[in-house]
Amino acid sequence: MLTSKDFRDQAINLIKKWNNIIDEIPWQWNQINELNNESKGYFTTKRYHKINNNNNNNNNNNIENKNNNNIENFEEIKETIDDSSTTIIKSNNNNNENNIIIFQFDIIYSKSYQVPVLYLNGFSSFDSSPLSWNEIWNNLPLSNLDKNQQSTIPYITQVEHPILGNPCYQLHPCETDNLMKLILLKEKDYNDNNDKKEYFKDYYLLSWLSIIGPMVNIKIPFDLLKNNNI
């Protein structure tokens, strides 16, 4: 389990390190102060992505059935995702605006599950209109993994944003805790100089994001993973 304090501390540290490596499209921490004086927040970023038109017709009929499945083999996902599928694409050419979409990613701490949860939305870069679920799904690497039956994963459901209140999509966190226990114990074998508690506290969020990120077009900087032995 991850505490809310650990989440905040790790998020702020991760944002600083990430933005020092890649600052074109930075992460930022949004602080929220509630009426009961409880302080909380979340971190957020955007990614610009070239529209994938190849799979639209093939995927549309199967989307509903695909999203009723769950995930089991996360390590296979990490090994099989092609980095080219998560390339950030930016364009200042107005003629290309219709071919670029914007993904908005928010990572928020869940008190119920005591784990980080990823929320996402997609928008047109041309007029900022929200994308349909089909348009979002067809442009996520996750859709290709599902189609090829390479693994099963915690699937995306439509929910209300827990802080902003707008409709968005959530990568369901029900198996996150079990997943992270396995990953952190495995990574602990390579970090004999750290006791279990310290390693858990320092690397939980980055380890989680290194698995979840490539599924949704978030490419983790190699130097960030290398410097933290992930």
UniProtKB/Swiss-Prot annotation:
UniProt EC number: 2.3.2.-
Active-site residues, record numbering mapped to chain: 174 (glycyl thioester intermediate)
Recorded GO CC terms: phagophore assembly site
Protein origin, superkingdom: Eukaryota
Enzyme class: transferase
Protein family: Belongs to the ATG10 family.
Protein name: Ubiquitin-like-conjugating enzyme ATG10
